[in-house]
Curated annotation (Swiss-Prot):
This is Spermatogenesis-associated protein 8. Expressed at high levels in adult testis, at moderate levels in sperm and at low levels in fetal testis. Not detected in other tissues. It comes from the Eukaryota. The gene is SPATA8. It comes from Homo sapiens.
Length: 105
């Protein structure tokens, strides 16, 4: 009985250790960093989100910048992510204001 109980406990801790890191990675750090890097390289990719429900309509980028950026590719990548991370995008929209100065520099 004792050895079985011990092996069961070991299995549990092993499983927990395996699950814990993946749970920590899942919620947001990885996706948000990807989104932020996209925002820094090309602000145009964020335009569809801002013009949506009523985000920031103030900073509108000139057409020249729109054409120079490869925003088509980024738009496609983000559009694919929207359904799975809509709450995440709302959080990023709020924070992206702080990140826009980096886009301009």
């Amino acid at each position: 009985m004792a050895p079985a109980g011990m092996s069961g406990a070991q299995d549990n801790s092993c499983l927990y250790q395996e699950i814990a890191p993946s749970f920590q990675r899942l919620p947001c750090p990885r996706t948000s960093s990807r989104h932020f890097s996209e925002a820094m390289t090309c602000p145009c990719g964020w335009r569809p989100f801002k013009g949506g429900p009523g985000g920031l309509k103030g900073p509108v980028w000139p057409a020249k910048e729109e054409n120079s950026c490869s925003h088509g590719r980024i738009q496609r990548v983000q559009r694919r992510r929207v359904p799975s991370a809509s709450p995440l995008i709302q959080k990023i929209n709020r924070r992206s204001v702080l990140f826009h100065p980096y886009c301009w520099s």
